[in-house]
Amino acid sequence: SYEIIIKTLQDQRLQELFTSVVYGSSKVASYHRKALNINDFNFNLVKKADQAHPRRPNIVNIHDEEIKLDLGKSTSIAGELALLSLEAACEDLVKKNIDAVVTAPINKNNIQSPGFSFPGHTEYFARKFGADNYLMLMVTHSVRIGVVTGHMPLSKVKDTLTEELIIKKIEVLDQSLKRDFAIHKPRIAVLALNPHAGDEGLLGDEEKNIIRPAIEKVFERNILAFGPYPADGFFGAANYRHFDAILGMYHDRSEEHTSELQS
């Protein structure tokens, strides 16, 4: 995470857009900076977020002790510090000391603890802030893609999908497009689960029995959702250009196309 954060904040243009506050260890950050041979970058060390310098990258120390680092290897202390950083950022978010949180990558294995028993950030934030209806949404300049089932093994996706769950995710996506992206009447494309959208039941019946009924019900509520579309043909024909957002059934299928379109 530190490598990504440091290299990102080296871009001085970002400091003109927002005041950056990193929650972590200044000593660990310094170690990474030296290991990367980055000499033209330093964090402004502050005790609290409200002391942040508006024109410099700031860091709030959540741990000031010496830490033995072995770059590229997972350690328990790394997971502990990642959780401490996340908790400190959430606390400041609640207190309105900061306006938003951007999460850097975590090791989802070494962060597991009594305070974090989640498959990812999305589920942690949902529990932390009491959100029953939430959605993982990946956004690029050209596409917005939401995910119904999020972080879970592919083997569990089929049994997790329900008409009610898909309806909830479509509704959350519709609300987000209107509120966060100021789109008055958003158009949402819903992707199929099975190849060729099930091929009339030959390759699976989730499209006919679960996904299509969910789309029809939200459409009756004036939500402009369409589908289900086979993912390969949908993206291959660039049909995503005709919609404001896309809802995929599972994580990797959605993220795969987001990455392709971003590159």
What is each PLM-predicted segment?
Residues E123-D132, L154-K178:
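Active-site glycine-rich loop that binds ribose-phosphate moieties when present
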